[in-house]
Amino acid sequence: MDAPNPKRPCLVPLGTSSIENPCSLPIAPDFNQSNIDLTISSFLSLSDLPLFSLPLSIGCSFDRVLDNVIPSIAGTSRDEFDQDRFLDRTLQLASLLYKSTKRCIRKRATLQNSTSWPLLPELTIKVFSMLDTKSLMQASACCTMFNKCAMDRVCYSHIDLTTAAEDVDNGVVCVMIHRAGKELRSLKLGSISSSAEPTTSLLTRSCLTPLTFNHGFTGGHLRSLHLYHLRMIDCGSLSPVLSACLNLTDLKIVGLDNPLEQLGLLTRNCRLIEHLFIEIYGAAGLITDSSLLEFAANCPNLSSISLLGFLLNDAILQKLIKGFRRLKHINLSSSPEISGCFFRGLELCGKDSPLETLILRDCYILKESEVLLFLNSLLAGDFKYIRLIDVSNVDGLVCDGGNRTFEPRFPIEELKKQRSNVTFVAIFESQSSLSSSRFPLEELNKERPGLTFVAEFRSPSPSESDVRSPSPSSSSDSSSSSDSSSSSSSGESSDESGTEEEEDED
């Protein structure tokens, strides 16, 4: 039995198929476009006839015509070639008709969407500009109307590729930056999750090079640059990029493998920078006075600084606070060299200091006595703009004799009365304080092993440690929550502790 669709031999090699290029079809000498249009229109008007099975169906008409035409070609000198060419042309015409029909369907759908979609194109573009880049690409694939709106440069003003970090390579970044053009305002690259392996990133050292194209035209419009866990990027690759971003005001680098001495180099060309956040992987060297002076001179408008994991000592920190007169937010968490002695040198500038947020989480040698001295200065009226202080430490604070305490003696009640708008967070997590709590955890584990007990003490999470503008409502509730935080960590519980208890049964 013959195969249902036997493969015809290709006697003459053919070039590029004219299916993809309709203009490649041969044109008759007496070609008349209007006659062709009329013929096709007459052909398509037969759609009311049955399509298959019946003798008067269009399908049977096709079969009869082909059966009659093919024998008429037989007997010529090149009958096999002419038959193959005729059949190929028939398939090409059928394909062209199919593609034209699909285009017509899409045009009708676009017209219907434009009439039924409640938002104007300008508002749709505005909504799309608020989406992260991955969601924007998904929306653009829905229909032609959305695709046209998603191609507007405004939609790429804020490029966020952190939600699809594993699929982003240099080419994707280049295309996104090119689409944004002069509308580019912010760019986020990398994986926000710290658990992501650095090998999963497809980006290289040159991923930010498109910002320097055309003499830095696109980079000159950039205002915010956030890079997360891109180990291959260092100061050597960042410096030429930042030199093109002259209007940058917000720089955030999480996971920088770089010594502290390069701070001045990073900010040398970004004199408008206001918010600086840098977290390093390993220990960095101590910053020198010359580097600090260069850093301060490069960033006269700096109002928020977060240096996580740096080897900053108290002397450098004191100069840092005094050197930046506009500093409102300071986050120096995980700095192993800060003891708190810098508080003593801030008495002269304390009253008029614009400082609003001070975060010293997990500073290993931070002393209880120095924190107490700072709190007393608050009671005396210094730092009148401060709203948030965080000295939480998983290892506790250093007390007299070099020991560590998880129950520091802080004037919480006085602070609540005199500075009720200040949020003071002091959470010290330790196994001893947990075991000494009044919760029967051991008995609960024995009696109900499938039960999960969660006791959450209200405090800013580590991911929110880079606070810029704490709301007044949160500040007003801080006095009770901060008092409860310190008391709860020492194993004391009360009805006013502000502790949230939640039980979830697996």
From Swiss-Prot:
Residues 459-492 have a biased composition (Low complexity). SUPFAM superfamilies: F-box domain, RNI-like. Residues 452-506 are annotated as: Disordered. Residues 493-506 have a biased composition (Acidic residues). Residues 115-161 form the F-box domain. PANTHER family: F-BOX DOMAIN-CONTAINING PROTEIN, F-BOX/TPR REPEAT PROTEIN POF3. This is F-box protein At4g02760. It comes from Arabidopsis thaliana. The lineage of its organism: Eukaryota, Viridiplantae, Streptophyta, Embryophyta, Tracheophyta.
